[in-house]
Amino acid sequence: AYRDASSSPVPVMMAFEGVGPTSFYPEDWKCYGFDQNAEAAAEMFSVMTGKEVTAEMFGTAEYDELVKDASALLWVNEDTVPTVMAYGQHDKFQPYEGSVRLDKALTENGVPHEYIVLPHSGHGLQNDNRLYAEYMAKVEEYLNKYMSE
């Protein structure tokens, strides 16, 4: 939604997601050890993006441009649509650390958003029933607010 909102043939008014891809910075993928092994990070991110990534690219503008299509974080600006998002703090599939970075970018750009962290859950958002219900209520609230205009 962030990448295509301005060019979509259907108006994108808001986004909601649970445990969606956020960023491809090795330091956000500690659970895989990618913060300690740049070569392994480059191999995995090559598979995930379908583009050749090398360890030497990390931290460069070239790298950001290469992974931009797959990284929600790199599309955030002041025109980003309002967002509701939920992440499990113990997620090993889409590491939680990237969601912290996405929340910060949305905040810094003044994007209306709700960031719900489920502290006992992994990728399935399965161990925090009250917070999951809060997430679903926020999705409904945002749908009513932004989709009824």
Where are these predicted regions, by residue range?
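Mobile cap/lid helix-loop segments that gate and shape the active-site cleft of serine hydrolases
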Residues: W29-W75
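Catalytic histidine-centered segment of alpha/beta-hydrolase-like enzymes
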Residues: S121-Y132
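Conserved alpha/beta-hydrolase "acid-adjacent" motif
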Residues: K92-V100
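Primarily recognizes the serine-hydrolase "nucleophile elbow" in alpha/beta-hydrolase
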Residues: A1-Y32
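Short beta-strand/loop motif that positions the catalytic acidic residue
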Residues: D79, M85-Y87, D91
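Catalytic histidine neighborhood in serine/cysteine hydrolases
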Residues: T107-H123
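Catalytic active-site module of serine/aspartate enzymes centered on a nucleophile-bearing elbow/loop
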Residues: L131-E149
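Acidic beta-to-alpha connecting loop that harbors the catalytic carboxylate
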Residues: P21, Q89-K92, H120-G122
